[in-house]
Amino acid sequence: MSDERGYSSADLPLYYEWHGKSAGSQPPLLRVHGGGSTIETNWGLLIPALEESRRLLAVELQGHGRTGTGAGPASFEGSAAGLAALLAELGVGPVDVLGFSNGGQVGLQLAARHPAAVRRLIAASAPFRREGMVDGFWAGLAAATLTDMPRPYFDADVAVSGDPAHAERMFHLDRELMLTGFTDFPDSLIASIAAPTLVVAADRDVVRTEHAVRLASLIENARLLIVPGSHGDYLGELFAAAGDSGPLERTVPFLTAFLDD
């Protein structure tokens, strides 16, 4: 249960929640979910693992969970700008950032375009070029329809938004974001990231291992962590972890060691 929640005052108000305890001089950890997700589906297992030692801020991006769908398409740059504005409005920053999948792409944009907002970045399973996805990913996404959306994600969104049409719009927003909205992030943009960065991927991820290596090589102050597992199970993500907290428990010490360094 969050101890504080609200919406930003932007044209598209972003829903946010606070969890956990202040940890001395440590900044809050902003968590940015992946596609098709809510706070609960992406971070339901991670929050209890961290809330005793750190102040946690979670948001829901355009069209996800309690945040409205908006009138236009989603973009990684736009989401990063919305997060920077939210942090300024809350009077916090620089913060540590953990972004998963699409949220990792937003985190990269946030660190590059709004460097004053980010102290440390964890970019988890985050592609920065289209070629970074495994074989078959793009063809599968292009052919996908709403019926291909895993039912737990659909139901989880409806549970908090109260509207099946919201979950349907979320599916189309995320699909179009990747198919048409995602253009390769320039190497120069990635190389401009000054925040210490931990690049994380799983050995059976949808992001190629060599792509994660390339991402880490472009950021001057970056480390690389390849963990056993699949896309998101190592963060306790609902569909990937399927209730098994083991991969998360094995990964958390690496994340906290990086954040506390």
Regions of interest found by a model, annotated:
Residues 206-211:
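Conserved alpha/beta-hydrolase "acid-adjacent" motif
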Residues 44, 48, 57-98, 241-249:
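Active-site loop/oxyanion-hole signature of alpha/beta-hydrolase fold enzymes
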Residues 193, 199-201:
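Short beta-strand/loop motif that positions the catalytic acidic residue
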Residues 173-189:
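Active-site nucleophile elbow and catalytic-triad environment of alpha/beta-hydrolase enzymes
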Residues 33, 95, 99-104:
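Conserved alpha/beta-hydrolase "nucleophile elbow" surrounding the catalytic nucleophile
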Residues 228-261:
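Catalytic active-site module of serine/aspartate enzymes centered on a nucleophile-bearing elbow/loop
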